[in-house]
Design a protein with these regions (language model features):
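Interfacial loop-to-helix junctions that mark the boundaries of transmembrane helices
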Residues: 13-19, 40-50, 82, 115-124, ...
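Hydrophobic core segments of alpha-helical transmembrane domains in multi-pass membrane transport
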Residues: 24-37, 51-61, 93-100, 130-141, ...
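Juxtamembrane and boundary regions of transmembrane helices in multi-pass small-molecule transporters
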Residues: 2, 138-153, 168-169, 201-247, ...
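Helix-loop-helix junctions within the multi-pass membrane cores of secondary transporters/permeases
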Residues: 78-79, 87-158, 336-417
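Transmembrane helix-loop junctions in multi-pass membrane proteins
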Residues: 32-46, 66-74, 100-115, 134-146, ...
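Transmembrane helical segments that form the transport core of multi-pass membrane transport proteins
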Residues: 243-356
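Intrinsically disordered, low-complexity non-transmembrane regions of multi-pass membrane transporters
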Residues: 1-19, 23, 74-88, 203-213, ...
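Alpha-helical transmembrane segments and their helix-start/interface "positive-inside/aromatic belt" motifs
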Residues: 14-22, 46-52, 80-88, 148-153, ...
Length: 515
C-alpha cells in the first residue's frame, strides 16, 4: 500500500496543476467583477475564495482517484458481465447497476427537494428506475449494434410529445433532471462499463459503441419525471434561495464550511457504498483480481472520496451564494444585458472545473488513439457551455419558454447525427450529460436564479432549465467538430493522389523507372 501511495505522488502534482488551470480563470473572472461592476460583501468573497481552494484540492484527488479506481472497476465489471453471453444476466445486472448508482447520487436529493408536490421517495425511485432501464437499452444497443441516432429520434420524440402535456411550471425542472442525475459519481463508472462491454466484442465498430451509455442514461430521468409531472400535476414547485453568509472573523468563516462537512462525508459515503458492494460481489464471484490491483483500487477510492467531499463542500458553501448574489447584482444594473456576455465568459471556463469532464476527455483521447485530443474536446465543451449559458440568460431576461430553445437544438443535434461519424455522435451525447455537473448546479443555476430575482421573473419557469441548456449545446459543438474532422480527412484523401501525380509529372521517364 505504501508503494502505491508513493507512486501516486507525482500524479497528484500533475493533477494539482490541471485543477489550478481549471479553477483559477473562474476565480479571476469573479474577482474582477467583484472589484469593478458587481461589488459583493467581504463575507461572500471570502467564502468564494476558500471554496475555490477546496475545489482545487478536490479536483486533484478526484481525477486521480477516478483513474485508479472507478475506471478499472467499471471496465472489469463491464467485461465480465459481457463474457457470460447470457442476455438475461447482462440486462438484469445492467438494470441493477443503473438503479443502485443513481439512487445514491447526491444531486438527485437536490432535485427531489425542488419538486415538493411529488413525494421524494417516489421521485428518487422513479428516476433511478429510469436510469436502470435506459442502461439496459444502452447495453442492448451495444450488443446488437443498433444505431444510436435512430434511438435518439425515438426517445427524444417521446420526450417532446410528453412535454406538451406537462405544466409549464414543471417543464424546466424535468429537463434539468437528465443532467443532474449523471453526476461525478455515476459518469466515470458508467463510461468505463461501456468500454468494458465494447472491448469484449472486438469488432471494428466496438470503439464507436463504447460511448453512448451516458447519453442513454440521461434520457431515462427526463421521461420518468415528465410522466410523474402528468400523474401528479406538479405545478407548485418552489424556490428556496441560498442563505448569504455573514462572517466577522476567520473562525466563523471556517465554521461555515466545517458545519457542512459531515453532510457531504455522509452523502459521498452513501454514494460510493453501492458501487463498492457490487464490485466486491463481482470480485468474489468472477474477477479474482490480485492484491496489488485491489490495493490500487482501494487507494483510488479513498482519493475519490476525499476529492468529492472537498469539491462538493467548496462548491455548495463557497460558490452557490456567490453565484446567486453575482446574478442579482449584474442583472440589477441599468445595463442588465451585461449578464449575457458575463454568463458566457463564466460558462466557457467553468466547465473545465467539472470533475467528470476530465474522465471523459481522457477516455476519448485513449479510445480514439489521440485522433480526438483532450484539448480539442475541452475546447468544444467550453464553446458549447458558453453558448448555452448565454441563451439561458436571454431566457431569464425575456421569460421565453425553454422549449423554443430545446426543440430546435435537439432537432438539429439529432439531424446532423446521421451525417457525422458515429463515434462523434456517441461522444457528443455523452458530453452533454457530463458537462451539466455539480459546477452547473452550484454556480450557473444560482447565477440564473439571482438574475431572475433581480428582474422580477418567475424562478421556476425562467431560471430553472440552465442544466438542460448546458446539456444540449455540447451535442452540437462536439458533432460539428467531428464533421469538420471528417471533411478535412476527405479533402486530404482527394489531394493525396493529385499531389503524388504532380510530383511524378516533374520527373524524367528514366527517373520514374528507377523509382
Amino acid at each position: 500500500m505504501d508503494a502505491i501511495l508513493k507512486a501516486s505522488l507525482p500524479k497528484l502534482r500533475e493533477k494539482l496543476l490541471e485543477a489550478l488551470q481549471a479553477v483559477l480563470p473562474i476565480a479571476a473572472i469573479v474577482l474582477v467583477l467583484c472589484f469593478t461592476i458587481a461589488p459583493v460583501s467581504p463575507s461572500i468573497l471570502l467564502c468564494f475564495l476558500l471554496g475555490a481552494a477546496m475545489i482545487v484540492v478536490g479536483i486533484m484527488f478526484f481525477t486521480l482517484g477516478a483513474e485508479m479506481s472507478m475506471t478499472p472497476m467499471g471496465e472489469r465489471v463491464g467485461a465480465v458481465i459481457t463474457k457470460s453471453r447470457k442476455l438475461p444476466v447482462i440486462l438484469g445486472i445492467g438494470f441493477l447497476l443503473g438503479f443502485l448508482i443513481t439512487i445514491s447520487e447526491p444531486d438527485l436529493q437536490v432535485l427531489a427537494n425542488q419538486v415538493p408536490s411529488i413525494p421524494n421517495r417516489t421521485l428518487i425511485l422513479s428516476v433511478a428506475a429510469g436510469v436502470g432501464l435506459f442502461l439496459v437499452f444502452a447495453f442492448l444497443r451495444m450488443l446488437i449494434g443498433i444505431s444510436l441516432p435512430k434511438l435518439l429520434v425515438l426517445f427524444y420524440g417521446m420526450i417532446f410529445l410528453l412535454a406538451a402535456f406537462v405544466p409549464k411550471e414543471f417543464l424546466a425542472v424535468a429537463f434539468d433532471s437528465g443532467g443532474v442525475t449523471t453526476g461525478p459519481m455515476t459518469v466515470p463508472f458508467i463510461m468505463a462499463l461501456g468500454v468494458g462491454v465494447s472491448a469484449i466484442r472486438g469488432d471494428r465498430h466496438a470503439a464507436d459503441d463504447s460511448f453512448g451509455l451516458v447519453a442513454m442514461c440521461s434520457i431515462g430521468p427526463i421521461l420518468a419525471v415528465l410522466i410523474l409531472g402528468i400523474v401528479f400535476r406538479a405545478s407548485d414547485s418552489t424556490y428556496i434561495p441560498p442563505v448569504l453568509p455573514e462572517v466577522s472573523d476567520s473562525v466563523e468563516l471556517w465554521q461555515l464550511f466545517h458545519v457542512s462537512l459531515p453532510t457531504y462525508l455522509e452523502e459521498i459515503a452513501v454514494s460510493l457504498l453501492p458501487i463498492i458492494v457490487m464490485f466486491g460481489i463481482f470480485q468474489f464471484v468472477a474477477l479474482y483480481m490480485d492484491r496489488r490491483s485491489l490495493g490500487r483500487i482501494a487507494v483510488g477510492l479513498a482519493y475519490t472520496y476525499v476529492g468529492l467531499v472537498l469539491f462538493l463542500t467548496g462548491a455548495n458553501v463557497g460558490f452557490m451564494p456567490a453565484g446567486n448574489y453575482l446574478g442579482q447584482v449584474l442583472a440589477g444594473q441599468s445595463f442588465r444585458w451585461i449578464i449575457i456576455p458575463m454568463g458566457m465568459l463564466i460558462g466557457y471556463f467553468i466547465v473545465k472545473a467539472e470533475p467528470a469532464v476530465y474522465v471523459l476527455n481522457k477516455q476519448v483521447e485513449e479510445v480514439t488513439d489521440g485522433a480526438i485530443s483532450a484539448q480539442a474536446m475541452g475546447t468544444a465543451l467550453s464553446a458549447g457551455v458558453s453558448i448555452s449559458v448565454g441563451l439561458a440568460m436571454v431566457r431569464v431576461l425575456t421569460g421565453v419558454s425553454i422549449l423554443w430553445f430545446l426543440v430546435p437544438g435537439y432537432v438539429f443535434a439529432i439531424g446532423i447525427s446521421f451525417v457525422v461519424p458515429k463515434l462523434f455522435t456517441a461522444i457528443a451525447f455523452d458530453a452533454g450529460g457530463v458537462a451539466s455537473g455539480p459546477m452547473t448546479a452550484t454556480f450557473l443555476l444560482p447565477l440564473a436564479q439571482g438574475a431572475c430575482v433581480a428582474v422580477g421573473g418567475n424562478i421556476v419557469t425562467d431560471a430553472f432549465g440552465v442544466v438542460a441548456m448546458v446539456a444540449m449545446t455540447p451535442l452540437i459543438t462536439v458533432q460539428l467538430m467531428g464533421l469538420v474532422a471528417q471533411l478535412r480527412t476527405r479533402k486530404a484523401r482527394r489531394l493525396q493522389p493529385a499531389a503524388m501525380g504532380a510530383a511524378f509529372a516533374g520527373l524524367p521517364d528514366d527517373d520514374i523507372i528507377e523509382l
